[in-house]
Amino acid sequence: MSKVLVLDAGHGLNTAGKETYKGSKGVIKEWSMNDSVCRKIQSILKDYDVTIYRTDDTTGKNDILLSERVRRCNNYNADLFISIHHNAYSNTTATGTEVYMHVNGTKEDKKLADLVAPKLAQKTGLKNRGSKKAAFAVLTCKATAILCEGGFMTTKKDYEVITTDSGQQAYAEAVAECIISFLGLKKKQITATTNTNKVYQVICGSYNQRSNAEKTKAQLEKAGFSGVWINVKQ
């Protein structure tokens, strides 16, 4: 049976105050960045034997209650829950990434947080603020759970990373690589079926002059194709 991963893009498009300062790309909603990272994680893991769900509204129109996110996670019987966020602080020099587990979390929660924290900093090139504990309600689900903060929306240095596609890709790769390692995920096995009773041929061109046919044959062979021949039809 495949493992179950639940991803959670924090907040929603209309959540008050959850946005970047007005930087070089303007003001960007936190949820849009969180959603981008979640989608990139899903894309990275598409070839792995894992079932993935989201607890947030994937249109961003509604900020789902934390209690509802927990309920959904539990209903999915998740093995792993990861909430994706970006940080903010009144001190505009605050920088770096950090990963939270619940204050009453398990050893597995700590193991996962300690695994993701340095990887997230390494991939994004931002300061590692470490793994921490907090009483975040969304982390009270039954699954092993962490909340990731991928850089400060209120700091120019971090803003220039987290608002880019490459920065969000780095965030996603860090989390995805840790998920693969933590859950011991394997790539899906693809079984090819072969019908030995049928043979398929590819025909490339028809010509009135044999010289033109010979020229095309030579071009195909030069390109690395084998089994090329000229069939003469009367």
Give the label of every model feature segment:
Residues M1-K111, Q169:
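Catalytic-core regions of hydrolytic enzymes
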Residues K3-V6, N14-G17, Y76, L80-S90, ...:
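Active-site-adjacent mobile loop/cap segments within catalytic or ligand-binding domains
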Residues D8, Q189-Q234:
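Solvent-exposed beta-strand motifs enriched in subsets of small alpha/beta binding domains
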Residues D35-C38, Q42, S67-V70, T97, ...:
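Extracytoplasmic/secreted envelope proteins and their assembly/folding machinery
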Residues R39-V50, N74-A78, A117-G125, A176, ...:
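Sec-exported extracytoplasmic/periplasmic mature domains
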Residues R54, G130-K133, W229-V232:
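A structural preference for short, hydrophobic beta-strand core positions in alpha/beta folds
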Residues E98, A145-L147, Q201:
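Residues embedded in well-ordered beta-strands
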Residues E108-K132:
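Active-site-adjacent substrate-binding region
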